[in-house]
Structure formats: C-alpha cells, structure tokens
C-alpha cells in the first residue's frame, strides 16, 4: 500500500494539485484532467480515498477554468480604452489592459527636483500649498500635479502639516472667492494670573516695547505704550506659569504647570519651535543666555528641580544640582564667562559655571526663609537675591563672592520680585507690604518708594508680587504687578502711578453692552466676581468699586433707570445694582430664592430666571414672581416682551407688567435644554440656542419656525446677539467658535474657529453692527471685524 501511495500517478497528481491557482492557461487544465483520469483508474484503495476527498475542489477548479476560457473569447469584442482620470474598477480591465496600466510611466524629475526643493519644507508657503491643494483641503492627483510619487507623498505630508498647524484652512478657498470673513482687530488681554504668597514673573523685550506674562492657559504679549494691543499664544495644555523674551527678541520661552517648556516665534505667526518636558511638576521660572541659545528652566519636580537645554533641539547643556526643595527663580549672566544662579524653598543660592553648566558653589547661610528672586545685573558685575525673609543680598556676578546685605528693615513683607535698571547701578523690588522701592547699589539704600492701594488700608489685593524694569526705554518706566492683577506704571521721580491697567484674571462669564451719548461701553463679569466696564473706542477697562459678588457672576442686564443702571446676579444667590455713570455698586444686595440661571431687563423691569420661577424686580426691589411649568434655564426680554427657556426644550413667550408675566405663546423649540435666547431689535423674531449647539429662529407673533439650519456648533450655545438691523445673528459656544448667520440666506454663514481657548461665553455687536466683541474662558475681550455680510 505504501508503494501505491507514492506511485508516479499519485506524485503527478500531488504536483498538479500544488500548482492549482498558479496556472491560468488551457494546457494546465488539460494536464489536470489527464491526472484526474489516471488517478481514477488506479486500483489502490488508499488512492481512491485521497481522490474522494479532493474531488469537489477539483471539479470547482475545472469549472472556473472553463468560465475563464469562455470569457477570453469575448474580450476581443469588448475592448475598452481608458484615459487618465477615468473612474474604473479593477474588474473592468482586461488582462492586457491591466498589464498596460501597470507599465504606465512616472516622471523621473518634476518641478521640485528642477528647483532643488524639498516638498516637506514648503508647508509654510501659502502660494505653493494653494497651487497643489483642492477646494476640500486635499492634494491634487498626480495627473494634475505632474510630480514623482515620492514628491507627491512628501507634498501631501507637508499639506497635512500646514493644515494641522493652522497655516492652511482645512476647506480652502482662494481669497478672491471669499465673499465675507471675520478677522481679529484687537485683543484686550487678560490680567496676569497671580497666587497669594507666590511671585509672578514679568518679562520685557530688549526694546522695552512689549510685556510678556502668563494668564490661565495662555501667554500674552502686550504693548507697554498701548495696553489695548496684545497678542495671545494658546498652545499650552496646562495652566501657564512664566514667559520670557529671548535677548534677540525673536522668540519667547514659556512654561506651564505640567513641566512643559515651549519655545515659539513672537515676531511672525507664533509657530511653536520646540516643546520640551523639563520637570514632572510646575515650572516656576526660566532664563535665556545672552546668545539666545540656551535655556535653564526650574520648578517643582520629583526627579529633578530644573534642567539646562538648547532651545532649538532640547539637547542637555548642563545639570541643576545642589538643591533639596523646589526652585523659585533662575538667572543667567549675559556675558562670558557664563554664570547661572538658582534659588528656592531650601533657602540656598547655588552658582553654576558654564557652558555646559556645572555646580560651582552653594550659599545657604544668607537667607532665613524662601528665596523668591535672583537676577544678574545687565553688565554682569552683580547678582542680587531677595526672599520671604525681607532681606536683599548682593554677590559678585563672576565669582559668586558675597558683597553684603542692603536695606535691612526697609520692607515689612516678603519681597517677591527684583529687576535691574539698564545702567546696572539701580534695581527695583516689589513686596507684600504694598511697596515698590528703587535701590542705589553703591549707596546701599532706597532712593524712592511707592505705596500702592488706598492710604491706610492693608488690602491683600494690593500686595506687589512682581516687577520688571523694561530696558531700552528713555522714560525710566517700570511696571509692578498687584495681587489683583493690576499693572502699575511707575516712573522714577513721580510719586503716583502714571497708569493702572486693569482687567480680568479669571474666566469672563457674562457680557452686556450699553450706548449712552453715542459712547459704547461693555460690561463684563468674571468667575471671581469682578465686574469691569470697557471703553469700546480705546479698549481700556475700569473695575467697578464697592461690595460686589464674591464669586461667579451669572449675568448682567441694563435698564434705563436714571442715567443708566446695570443689574448683576451671581452664584451667591443675590442681585445687585451698579450705577453706570459712577461705576460703583449702589444700595444693598437682594437675596434670591435660588441659584440664578440668567438675567434680562425690559424698559424698567428686571427678570431673574431660576429653576422653579422667574423673579421680577423694579428699581432694585422685588415686585413679583412667575411660576413656570418647567425648570427654567435662561431668560430674555425686550421692551414689554419676555421669553423663558426650559430644561424640556420649550420656550414660553410672555408679556411683562410691573409685577407679573402673562403667557402669550408656547414654542416646542428643541429636544434639548434651551441655553440662550435673544430678541431681534424690533422684537419680531426670537433666536433660540440649545445645549447641543443648534440655533433656531422663530416668529414672536405666532411662534412659527423661520429657520433651523444653523447647526454648525458642536457644543452648548452660550450667547446670541442680533445686529442693529436684525438681519444677522452672532452665536458663541463652548466649542470655542463664533458664527455669524444670515436670516435672509440661512445657508450662508461666517465662521471663526478657536476664538477663545476653552469656550466663548458672550458675544455682542458694536460700532454700528460692523464689528463683534466676544469674551470667553481665557479672560480676554476680543474685537472682530466682519466684512461682506449679505
């Protein structure tokens, strides 16, 4: 039996079976048939068993071969010519055409080869990207680009990079085709973020024109001469802590609470040049060397407290050693030989020689408490250190030798900041005793003192937690930072601040706009309870004085009482009034029955929405209450009309009287909770925004739907506003985007993406309806110009 199993006929059958699927000729099918016939005549029992097992698959193979043979006879009469760009499927091609298609030739050289350019380097070139980009943000096919496959792939990668970095729009249209657009006109920056008992770092460029500081998750570069002009960097994912200009003035290095340092272009488009993980904790300070090549960043980490790197590659150029607790400050000598100094909570000042930077010596017997600031003088001859023990120590900038202590007993609080004058003969300090002092190095005493805040008051908000003496200026200006976030412009020789720049430190949660005597004013409230008014023409802000809300401001509304009155509600469950002309709180707070969901005002009536009712106020006093059949989420008013939105997606339109609301119509607006409402200027239409990002418009007269096509937002609608003519609606959302919608052409809109980091909280029209202002979680107020509305 074993001989029969390995007979020649069986071997031929096995060989034929192994070649099934590889042969597609008619000869192979004939050989297979002969092998099958030969095997069937074999008398061996084992061979018959093997035959029966393989019979079904063999028959199927033979049938497939027969079908293929018949189809080839028809191919002669079904030839088809294909051109480049035709839509086809592989099974449409004959074998001959498939071979021809597979032999198509690609160009050996193309435009990039001729010009010796790398397509990957072209991602910044808008003209090149536009030439090779389709209207849907994709690269054009090779039949149109004429590129080699390698360069085609490289250019596609460059295009994806440009879109990812925001250099190219994902849906591209040439500028001449764009009929309407929205662009930033000005950014009214947030105030620096501060923490009680901690220093806040300020930095100025070499020309003394711009100020850099950290606020929330952004970095702001602010004009010193015109604080209404600013630039915002938003690439950090965590709370930002420090920002420093490079001596060259072309780059900024910034750190955050996650231990990340980012280096970015501060002259061009703000492109990030590098991102480096320094410590696994908070970055407290960083410093550049005089060549703008090396950075030392320090903070609070578990494995190390700082690191030295090159800004362009992140390569290590030294180690930070000699400390046992977190570091608060660092400085690098700008002259050679390079020196560096660090200090922190371990009360020790450590000197390094570089580069690469290595430990040289540590001084632990001078300060008796935390050290908050060290800085080399511009000429490199001195080093000064200050701290929570209220002491000021001077050292030799080259050797680290201690020169002595000055100003003992002058400051009555922790010294949080120090900065040198450009002549290296004087420096300035900022302290928690509310004072800023200028010191003469040679005399060893203070030459001028400013006391910030009200006379005789020791308000915590007036603690001075940071200071910078901008170089390159001829007016002897220095800038100090209060714990409240106010920037104080101080000029040597003058007793009072020349200017105080105010703003918001926390997320702006509410916005209202008023116009009195053709002067437009914005009113903003923030998460920490601060309310400010802004001059739209100049972009300057003033904080409202008096006893306000201790926390979250949930809404602002305007009435025509007297010379104008602003009403505010907060999460302290109170409603308060503000005299618009005096810019101060008036009267006492009125207690609400529950947490406010929103506030709106008619001519003289104020409505405060709560979960179970709408409270009615006149002249600061409660006059009535309206119980709703649903849980109220928002409220709007215009003249004698009011609208209440509910958790169930319904909107109730009511008439306002002095003490009650009279229902007029019920609208089933959405399946989702209503989040925002706005009446048109003539009260003929009502715009409705819901929790899922939809915006709808209804007629007030009969509740009929006008449009439900405005669905581009992807998160809760936080604010809606009509332009003065009632033709367009602007919407803001937690998705960070702003849209301008056309009532006449519901399918047309203008989009502004990433208007505010982490969400837009308020929008309004200004300057006659040609510009928009917005506020958001980044604590900034931004003005946008809208062109070509239809």
Mark where each language-model region is.
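N-terminal mitochondrial targeting presequence
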Residues: 1-49
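Mature, matrix/stroma-exposed regions of nuclear-encoded mitochondrial and chloroplast proteins
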Residues: 36-143, 153, 157-181
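A short helix->beta-strand "capping" segment at the edge of beta-propeller domains
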Residues: 182-197, 226-228
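WD40/WD-repeat beta-propeller blade N-cap
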Residues: 192-197, 234-240, 276-283, 321-327, ...
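Loop/turn segments within WD40 beta-propeller blades
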Residues: 202-208, 244-249, 287-293, 330-338, ...
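Conserved strand-to-loop turn within each blade of WD40 beta-propeller repeats
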Residues: 215, 255-258, 298-302, 342-346, ...
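WD40-repeat beta-propellers
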Residues: 219-223, 261-265, 306-311, 349-354, ...
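Blade-level signature of beta-propeller repeat domains, shared across WD40, Kelch, NHL, RCC1
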Residues: 760-790
């Amino acid at each position: 039996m074993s001989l029969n199993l390995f007979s020649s006929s069986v071997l031929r059958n096995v060989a034929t079976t192994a070649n099934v699927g590889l042969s597609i000729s008619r000869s192979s099918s004939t050989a297979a048939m002969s092998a099958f016939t030969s095997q069937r005549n074999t008398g061996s029992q084992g061979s018959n068993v093997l035959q029966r097992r393989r019979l079904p698959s063999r028959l199927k193979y033979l049938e497939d071969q027969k079908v293929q043979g018949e189809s080839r006879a028809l191919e002669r009469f079904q030839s088809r010519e294909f051109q480049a760009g035709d839509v086809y499927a592989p099974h449409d091609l004959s074998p001959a055409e498939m071979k021809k298609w597979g032999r198509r030739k690609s160009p050996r050289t193309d435009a990039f080869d001729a010009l010796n350019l790398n397509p990957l380097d072209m991602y910044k070139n808008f003209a090149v990207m536009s030439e090779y980009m389709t209207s849907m943000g994709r690269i054009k096919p090779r039949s149109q680009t004429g590129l080699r496959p390698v360069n085609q792939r490289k250019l596609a990668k460059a295009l994806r990079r440009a879109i990812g970095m925001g250099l190219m729009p994902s849906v591209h249209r040439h500028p001449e085709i764009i009929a309407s657009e929205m662009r930033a006109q000005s950014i009214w920056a947030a105030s620096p973020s501060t923490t009680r008992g901690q220093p806040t770092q300020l930095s100025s460029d070499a020309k003394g024109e711009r100020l850099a500081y950290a606020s929330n998750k952004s970095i702001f570069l602010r004009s010193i001469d015109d604080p209404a002009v600013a630039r915002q960097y938003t690439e950090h994912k965590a709370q930002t802590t420090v920002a420093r200009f490079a001596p060259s003035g072309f780059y900024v290095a910034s750190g955050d609470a996650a231990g990340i340092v980012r280096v970015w272009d501060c002259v061009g488009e703000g492109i990030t040049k590098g991102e480096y993980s320094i410590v696994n904790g908070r970055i407290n300070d960083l410093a550049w060397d005089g060549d703008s090549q090396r950075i030392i960043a320090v903070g609070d980490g578990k494995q190390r407290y700082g690191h030295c790197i090159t800004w362009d590659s992140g390569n290590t150029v030294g180690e930070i050693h000699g400390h046992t607790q977190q570091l608060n400050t660092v400085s690098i000598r700008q002259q050679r030989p390079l020196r560096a100094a660090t200090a922190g909570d371990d009360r020790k000042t450590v000197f390094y020689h570089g580069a690469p930077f290595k430990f040289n010596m540590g001084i632990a017997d001078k300060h008796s408490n935390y050290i908050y600031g060290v800085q080399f003088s511009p000429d490199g001859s001195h080093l000064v250190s200050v701290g929570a023990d209220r002491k000021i120590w001077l050292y030799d900038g080259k050797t680290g030798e201690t020169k002595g202590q000055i100003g003992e007993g002058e400051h009555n609080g922790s010294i949080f900041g120090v900065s040198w004058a450009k002549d290296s003969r004087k420096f300035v300090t900022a302290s928690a005793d509310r004072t800023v002092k200028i010191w003469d190095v040679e005399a060893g005493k203070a030459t001028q003192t400013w006391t910030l805040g009200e006379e005789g008051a020791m308000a915590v908000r007036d603690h001075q937690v940071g200071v910078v003496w901008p170089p390159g200026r001829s007016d002897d200006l220095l800038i100090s930072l209060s714990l409240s976030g106010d920037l104080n412009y101080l000029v040597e020789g003058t007793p009072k601040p020349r200017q105080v720049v105010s703003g918001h430190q926390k997320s702006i949660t509410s916005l209202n706009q008023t116009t009195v005597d053709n002067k437009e004013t914005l009113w903003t409230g923030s998460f920490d309870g601060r309310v400010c008014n802004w001059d739209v023409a100049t972009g300057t802000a003033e904080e409202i004085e008096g006893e306000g809300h201790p926390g979250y401001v949930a809404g602002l509304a305007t009435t025509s009482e007297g010379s104008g009155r602003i009403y505010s509600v907060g999460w302290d469950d109170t409603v308060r009034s503000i005299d618009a002309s005096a810019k101060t709180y008036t009267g006492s707070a009125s207690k609400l029955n529950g947490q406010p969901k929103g506030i709106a005002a008619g001519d003289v009536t104020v409505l405060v929405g709560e979960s179970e009712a709408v409270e009615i106020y006149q002249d600061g006093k409660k006059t009535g209450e309206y119980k709703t059949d649903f849980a109220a989420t928002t409220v709007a008013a215009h003249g004698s009309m009011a609208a209440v939105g509910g958790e169930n997606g319904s909107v109730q339109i009511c008439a306002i009287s002095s003490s009650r609301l009279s229902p007029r119509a019920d609208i089933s607006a959405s399946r989702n909770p209503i989040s925002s409402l706005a009446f048109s200027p003539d009260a003929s239409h009502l715009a409705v925004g819901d929790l899922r990002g939809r915006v709808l418009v209804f007629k007030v007269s009969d509740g009929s739907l006008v449009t439900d096509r405005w669905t581009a937002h992807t998160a809760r609608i936080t604010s809606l506003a009509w332009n003065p003519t009632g033709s367009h609606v602007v919407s803001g959302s937690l998705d960070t985007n702003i849209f301008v919608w056309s009532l006449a052409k519901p399918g047309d809109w203008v989009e502004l993406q990433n208007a505010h980091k982490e969400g837009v909280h308020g929008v309004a029209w200004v300057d006659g309806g040609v510009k928009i202002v917005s506020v958001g979680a980044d604590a900034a107020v931004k003005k946008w110009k809208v062109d070509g509305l239809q």
